[in-house]
Amino acid sequence: TATLNGHTASAVVEVTGAMQYNVDLVITSSVAVTHAPTKTSYFTGETFSSAGMVVTATMADGSKKTVTGYTCSPTTMAANTTAVTVSYSEGGVTKTTTTPVTVTSISNTLASNSWATIRAVSDAGKGSNYWSVGDAKGITINGKVGATTISNLAISVFILGFNHNASREGSNRIHFQIGKINGTLVGLVDGNYSNYTSTTGAFTMNTSNTNSGGWNNSHMRKTVLGSNSTSATSPTANTLLAALPADLRAVMKPATKYSDNTGGGSDTASYVTSTTDLLPLLSEFEYHGARSYANSAEKNYQAQYDYYRAGNSKVHYRHNATGTAAGAWC
């Protein structure tokens, strides 16, 4: 046993005769994280990763060396975790240090999470680790939508799928649909429902009996929904997008959607092109997984949403009369 500067360490030697031995004892004086790990932000339940972390031990004689063989605690991130303790032992001496981490608490109940938290989970591509298709969160729609004022409508948005059709529409996305009222799938209707009208701002696909210009140039996309807005935080005025809550709009991501953007009734494959949308309607194929009326080439670029593939009802009801079925644009 030897002591140096208050540090004690031991080593075992074998004495075979009357001989003098010089024993070098390696004594750890301190340990430090000299390069932070690559990943420092976690969600609750994730496992700490030391990848990229460099741990340096200072010996009692003042020398330094990069070490491995350290241990880390805790390994599973909890809501109250702010740092991970790193421990290293050598020569019978254990020294510790800490490295800071940030842990975001995730509730498995979708509605208990803020939209900012949901966005963070979406960005990490981990939505399905915490929530399920069909899970819902309540919002309030408030504002003028086209020519109709909707005042403080409580409605739930629900998950249609995780990373839906990601290779075409964009990765790390959670797709939601608006919406349900007390569990009933609804469509928003206005005072012109079931009547022909040329009124600008009515909930119609176009203001005349035409599909010229397809989805891209439709009255529904631009004037009613505001789906073509350049930013969800700067939406086109008097659109559904503008009437959504600000905290939801702050985290919305656009998706690349494929549809017939020429129109005219000719079933021409080249008419199917992409648009960037913040608030698109679902297509026939996304609802049904089959095509009857849409351009037959659309389905080559689309996928049925998991929510509807699971057999959930596609019947919509009027948002202001939830016992009355309604036709839905698609």
Task: Outline where the language-model segments fall.
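Serine/threonine-rich, repeat-prone extracellular segments and beta-strand-based repeat modules
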Residues: T1, G62-K95
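Extracellular/surface recognition and adhesion modules
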Residues: T1-A2, V13, V33, V55, ...
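Protein-protein interaction and targeting regions used for scaffolding, dimerization, and localization
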Residues: H7, V31, P37-Y42, F48, ...
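Edge beta-strands of extracellular beta-sandwich domains
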Residues: T8-V15, K95-T102
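Solvent-exposed, conformationally flexible loop/turn segments
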Residues: T16-M19, F43-G45, A79-N80
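Extracellular interdomain linker/stem segments of modular secreted and single-pass surface proteins
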Residues: T16-N22, V26-T28, V103-S107
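Solvent-exposed, low-complexity, repeat-rich "mucin-like" stalks and linkers
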Residues: I27-K64
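Collagenous Gly-X-Y triple-helix signature in extracellular proteins
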Residues: I106-C330
